[in-house]
A protein has these predicted regions:
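An anionic, glycine-rich sequence signature occurring as long contiguous blocks
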Residues: 206-314
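Dynamic "connector" segments at or just before major functional cores
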Residues: 1-119, 128, 140-152, 166, ...
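Generic secondary-structure signature for well-ordered alpha-helical cores
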Residues: 170, 199, 221, 225, ...
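Short, conserved catalytic/metal-binding motifs centered on acidic residues
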Residues: 42, 57, 81, 85, ...
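Short acidic (Asp/Glu) and glycine-rich catalytic loops that position anionic groups and cofactors
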Residues: 21, 196, 288-293, 304-306, ...
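Polybasic low-complexity intrinsically disordered regions
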Residues: 107-180, 186-199
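Basic, amphipathic alpha-helical segments enriched in Lys/Arg and hydrophobic/aromatic residues
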Residues: 36, 311-388
Length: 388
């Protein structure tokens, strides 16, 4: 059987296409009609150009078969059926290898600077709910400001995030990175792991660390009784504030930091504690909502200003407008029915790669705008996956 493989070297070594071609294929060569790298790059191309579902991807490729043959330098014009994409993603792709390749590829993109924030967070793939009672649950390490996933693993559920998080972070280069997660991840051992790997952490103190939360809260309470012989000792508080308008409300965030508890609180590498007040006013009703949270960080006062710390925390809380929104709404991840758990995980990983490619090109105002452009210019989409 004549296989639909490439007949010439048309790739830059560091391109996404080259990375996909490097993945191992467990199928025997006899009877293998389509290479794994070819299938994956066709999925990525179709997604760049606006397709989300496997049937739509297959039709998009079929209608552009002559273009695909020319660009990919294939031997034959016949393109895969949508069931072929599903079968290969569910049965042939090695998820761990695909995740590692994705990590290596995205880490090579120019997203990084000093003290870049890496967030850890879990997500249910609702499109896989038929595959299991709770659907596929993924734990990701990602860049909130970009919505880019660096590493993602499947876990049993939210309760499995704590043991899985160290494994995810171990696969990353944490030097010059600042790791943040929700209160579930405020754990001593992961704090040690992060700092020993050259990174820093920002944690929220809530119900799972009640004593830490109470100690920090009391520190920021106004002094009501003098200390015998000392009166009211001075505190080293520094404050930053930002006000933003949008989504029908005015929101003011006020962050106050202190370094004076670092020698009193029993937490590894703790340098500063903080209080964050959020006050929002509804433009329509005038309703006022206030929230106060407490946390701590391993970052020194000289390494980060209160305003910079405030913005990092806000960046983390922007996940719904970053990673989750882009994948759920723009790439329709939660609306794409996938009755096999492994298929859902593979598609999520490819979505991460698509977002990484699109976000590495800053000339597009939004992800939908970029996809509309590539829909009209598929040859440019091919350049994106085949060139550095």
């Amino acid at each position: 059987m004549e296989s639909n493989t490439q007949v010439g070297n048309i790739l830059d070594v560091g391109s996404l296409y080259a990375h996909l071609q490097s993945l191992s294929d467990k199928r025997k060569r006899r009877g293998r009609r389509y290479s794994l790298g070819m299938i994956l790059v066709l999925v990525v191309l179709a997604k760049l150009c606006g397709e989300n579902h496997m049937s739509g991807i297959a039709e998009w490729v079929k209608h552009r078969s002559e273009m695909m043959v020319e660009m990919l330098q294939l031997k034959r014009k016949q393109m895969p059926h949508h069931s072929t994409y599903r079968r290969i993603l569910a049965e042939v792709v090695k998820i761990e290898e695909l995740e590692q390749m994705s990590n290596e590829f995205l880490s090579g993109k120019k997203f990084f600077g000093k003290q870049v924030l890496v967030a850890i967070d879990g997500k249910v793939l609702r499109g896989t709910l038929d595959a299991g009672q709770n659907g596929t649950y993924l734990l990701a390490a990602y860049l909130p400001s970009e919505g880019i996933v660096l590493m993602e693993v499947a876990i049993e559920g939210k309760g499995s995030e704590i043991p899985a998080a160290p494994k995810v972070l171990k696969s990353l280069d944490l030097r010059d990175k600042v790791v943040m997660g929700d209160a579930l991840h405020t754990q001593r051992q992961i704090s040690i792991q992060i700092v020993m790997a050259g990174g820093e952490y920002i944690w929220i103190a809530k119900g799972n660390q009640p004593q830490m939360e109470e100690d920090i809260r009391l520190w920021f309470e106004p002094d009501v009784q003098p200390i015998p012989g000392l009166g009211f000792p001075p505190k080293d508080f520094e404050t930053a504030q930002e006000t933003n308008k949008g989504h029908g409300r005015i929101e003011t965030r006020t962050l106050t930091v202190s370094s004076q508890l670092k020698d009193f609180l029993d937490w590894p590498f703790l340098e500063q504690v903080f209080q964050l007040r959020r006050r929002s006013i509804s433009n329509r009703t005038g309703e006022i909502r206030e929230q106060v949270v407490y946390g701590f960080t391993s970052l020194l006062r000289k390494e980060i200003t209160p305003l910079q710390l405030l913005r990092k925390i806000r960046s983390y809380w922007g996940i719904e407008n970053g990673l989750h929104y882009r994948r759920d709404v723009t790439l329709r991840e939660d609306y794409t029915r996938m009755t096999q758990v492994k298929l859902g995980h593979a598609v999520a990983c490819l979505n991460n790669l698509v977002l990484g490619l699109l976000l590495s090109k800053h000339k597009y105002r939004t992800i939908p705008a970029a996809r509309r452009y590539f829909s009209a210019h598929p040859a440019d989409a091919f350049q994106l996956v085949s060139r550095l």
